[in-house]
Amino acid sequence: MRIAVLKFPGTNGDYDVLRALELAGARGELVWYRDYAAGKYDAVVLAGGFSYGDRLRAGAIAAATKAMDHVREDAERGVPVLGICNGFQILTEAGLLPGALIPNDPPGFISRWVAVRVVDTRTPFTYLYEEGEVVYMPIAHGEGRYVPAGEYKAAFKYVDNPNGSYDNVAGVYEKNVLGLMPHPERAVDPHVSRRGAGGLKLWLGLISWLRR
């Protein structure tokens, strides 16, 4: 099993993802974006951060790289793809997920724990959750307000909307591709996570799905 953790200039959540995978029983591989190639990995995670300093728009420059062409190719083959925070922004900019992430309303950077409801369990990342289950994860973003572009499928919704996101959406998916603004990799260890380990099931679900 090979799980790539894709790193762009400005990515800063990569080691948190590697740690989350380790706690869930797998070993991720940190992959510099120029070294990523389609057909080599069983899953890929786009970690959070500020790729290219959020120039132009959050995720816009990373979305235009050759690496994302390879990610798109893998996604079309059914490889599970996860984008967290800035990774979610990259996926929308690249057209792998519908809609866009725009500045928060009210504006400003938000960094706190939030309650998130699982509303769809039909993905490789959510199928171990119960539909309607509420978990806690931290958020840390200034451009996390989701706006749809036509039809979309929500996987997670905020219990108490922190950023003005349409219909309380915290994460959306399309087949095997999932993006979410909350950070499941920072909610995996009950000894250090302030509000429990609600993100751990996401990683356990991915690993279980890959082992089927």
Swiss-Prot record:
Pfam families: GATase_5. It comes from the Archaea. It catalyses: N(2)-formyl-N(1)-(5-phospho-beta-D-ribosyl)glycinamide + L-glutamine + ATP + H2O = 2-formamido-N(1)-(5-O-phospho-beta-D-ribosyl)acetamidine + L-glutamate + ADP + phosphate + H(+); L-glutamine + H2O = L-glutamate + NH4(+). InterPro entries: Class_I_gatase-like (IPR029062), PRibForGlyAmidine_synth_PurQ (IPR010075). Its EC number is 6.3.5.3, 3.5.1.2. Residues 2-212 form the Glutamine amidotransferase type-1 domain. One of its GO terms (cellular component) is cytoplasm. The active site is at C85, H183, E185, H191. GO terms for molecular function: ATP binding; glutaminase activity; phosphoribosylformylglycinamidine synthase activity. CDD domains: GATase1_FGAR_AT. Part of the phosphoribosylformylglycinamidine synthase complex involved in the purines biosynthetic pathway. Catalyzes the ATP-dependent conversion of formylglycinamide ribonucleotide (FGAR) and glutamine to yield formylglycinamidine ribonucleotide (FGAM) and glutamate. The FGAM synthase complex is composed of three subunits. PurQ produces an ammonia molecule by converting glutamine to glutamate. PurL transfers the ammonia molecule to FGAR to form FGAM in an ATP-dependent manner. Part of the FGAM synthase complex composed of 1 PurL, 1 PurQ and 2 PurS subunits. This is Phosphoribosylformylglycinamidine synthase subunit PurQ. It comes from Pyrobaculum aerophilum (strain ATCC 51768 / DSM 7523 / JCM 9630 / CIP 104966 / NBRC 100827 / IM2).
